[in-house]
Amino acid sequence: MDGLHRRAGNQHLLELHGNLFRTKCFSEERPVESWPDSGEIPPRCPHCGNVLRPDVVWFGESLPVATLHAAEHAAATAEVFFSIGTSALVYPAAELPFSALAAGATVVEINPHPTPLSAHVSYSLNGAAGVILPALVARVWEPA
């Protein structure tokens, strides 16, 4: 949602909760790249005149169906699945690690505190992702 993965160079992203740096029409759900600067707040869709909004999933809204299906497929075909920094409480996204487990993947959870997922995963690592992930990468890439 915050665009950090894309700015880090990742090209193959499934943004289940959207992207704060994209805009869409409130009524038509169509992406809007640009609009006339009329000074109106919020800005209006150049196609239909309705208000524009960030292209994110707000509480109570459904996840984008195509993106969710792609994420489900990725989870079901993964060899290793990382669940990082999530409460593991909000479905349907919280189901993804369980799909990976059911398909035989190694599931690694990284979180400051245990979650409902913790007892089910292959590895539950409690701590800050900013500390644990660099340590994992260093360990994987260290010479034998």
Q: Which role does the model predict for each range below?
A:
Residues 1-144:
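Conserved catalytic alpha/beta core of Sir2/sirtuin-type deacylases, generalized to analogous enzyme cores
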